[in-house]
Amino acid sequence: MSSATRSIVLTAIAILALLSLPNHSRSNAKPDDWRPLFNGKDLTGWKHVGPGEDTVEDGLIRTHGGMGLLYWTAEKFGNCRIKVVYKMRDHNDNSGVFIRIPIEPREPWMPVHYGYEVQIDNQPEDSKEDEYHVTGTLYSLTKPLARPGKPGPEWNTMVITLDGPHTVVVVNDVKVTDYTEGQPVPARKFDFEPQHGLRPNEGYIGLQNHSDNDIVFFKEVAVQPLH
């Protein structure tokens, strides 16, 4: 065997050996992997602001009182999917998932006005704004494409996709919201409705505790990169 041939053979063997090794970085960060933000035991990584509180009971996040906000402190999220699995204590209860919060909140109203609240409320109070307050809508800004939210103690799965300025909300495998920054939104009528304006592509996320009469349980909060 010539030295040139021997060199080629040894190089091929080395490449095959490398390919046979486990790719730890790939196996730990697959694009289709969901990364849990709630460990099922405590609220490590989360911080509460505003009235009320959130506790962990039987492996679930439970809302108490309000209106307050439990947000993930470690990082902002963009170009990802956010999965939230939740249920209501009663036939209908009010909560929400906040996205695109520009800075760490110090009180609960800043995320309402300068982020987006993805609503959890199957039967909003009777008003002209009802269409804009249904589960899966961007609160006060978008009408629902469908109303697939399940009542009472039934589990719901909400998946929020953040793709640059594009936001898509799917509830129980049914699309409810498909919104891109800059699309028309209804005029603001009440002080509690969000301020109009563009939101950042990346932001903090949080869970709302709405009031003493609105108890919601969260079983899973997870993120998945888009790219």
Question: For each predicted feature, which ranges?
Answer:
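Carbohydrate-interacting regions of secretory-pathway proteins
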Residues: 21-227
